[in-house]
Amino acid sequence: QHPVAGDLKCKLTGRMLMDGGVYLKNDNLFGNGTEFNDLRLGVKATYQNWSMKMEVGYVGNKVSIKDAFAAYTSGKHIIQVGQFYEPFTLDMLCSTYDLRFHQSPGIVLALTNGRRMGTSYTYNGKHYYASGGFFTDSDLGNVKNISQGYAIDGRLVYRPVNEEGKLLHIGAAVVYRTPDSALPGDEDENTFIYKSPGVSTIDNRNLIYAKVDHAKYQLKQGVELMIAHQRFFLQGEYIRTMVKREQNFTNYAGHGGYVQCSWLLTGRQYGYDEALACPGRPVGRALELCGRFNILDMNNEEAGVWGGAQKDFSLGVNYYMNKHIGMKLAYSWVMPGKHIKEISDKNFSVVQLRFQMIL
C-alpha cells in the first residue's frame, strides 16, 4: 500500500488462478487441458470515508472490466455506485480466491447474474445485515444499444452468533428483474437465459441452458445458511426463479440448491467478510478437506422449457500456504439428468488442480 498526498492511499492488486483438468470416464469426449480461470490486475484507493476499486480481468481469451465502483462508508452504512455484483446469493458474492472449489455450484452459476451497473445501500451491523440496490442490465464489457432491463435487489442476513471463530448466518434474498428490449426482429426480445458449465470450465460447454421467451419479468428468491465453529464450516443455499410470461404462455420456474462443508486438518479457524456477509478463506496457513453436493432442475414441462437437470458431488483438498498463495485439488462426479445440453446423460468425472495467488 502506497500513501499519496494527504489522506489518499493507493494499492495495486492482482490475482492469478491457474487450473488444469483431466476428465475421467469420458464418454462425452471432453477436452483435457489448462486455463487461467481468473487473471486480474487492479487498483484500490481510499480517501477519508471514500473508497474506489477498479479491476481488469482476462478470462476465456477475453479482456473485460471486473469491479469498477466507488463507495462511501459512514459507521455501519455503505453507499456504493458503479459496476459490481448484485446482493444476491451467498456464493457469488464470495471472491473466486476464497471459493472452496474451482467453480461456484451449478445452481448459483445458472441463477445469478454477473456484475452489473447500479447503486446499492448496505447496513452492516454485528448481528443484522441488510443490502438493497437498483441495477440496469448493462456491464462495461457488454454495452447494449437497446433499452436495458432493470433489477431491484434485496438481501437480509441475521447473525445471532458473530464472534471470532464462531458464526451462525441466516439469510434471504430476492431479485425482481425485467428483460431487455431488442432490435427489430431480434429473437432474444423479452427473453431470459439461464446457463451453467457445471463443475469445470476446462471444457466450457454449457450443460444447463434454459431459454425462456415472451417474458414480462422474473422473480428470483434465495435462502442461505452458514455455520462456522473453529475448524468446522458449513454452507448451503436454495435458489428459485419464476418467470412471468405474456398472455397465452405458461409461467416458467426452475430451482436447485447445494450444501457444502469443510474441516481444517491444520489451521485455526475460518475468516468471514462482514461487509459482504460472505465466507472468507481460512486464517493463516491451513490444510482443508471439503465436500459439496449440488442439484438443479431447469426443466419445466408446463412451460415447454427444457433447460436440463444435473446433480454433482465433489471432494477437495486445499492448502493455503499463507493469505496470498494456495493450491486446490478436487474430484467431481457429475450425474446429468433429463434434457442435459451438449452431452449424453452418462455420468462422468473430472479431476482438477489449481495454483492461486492474490495480492
Regions from the language model: what does each represent?
Residues 27-28, 186-359:
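Outer-membrane beta-barrel pore domains
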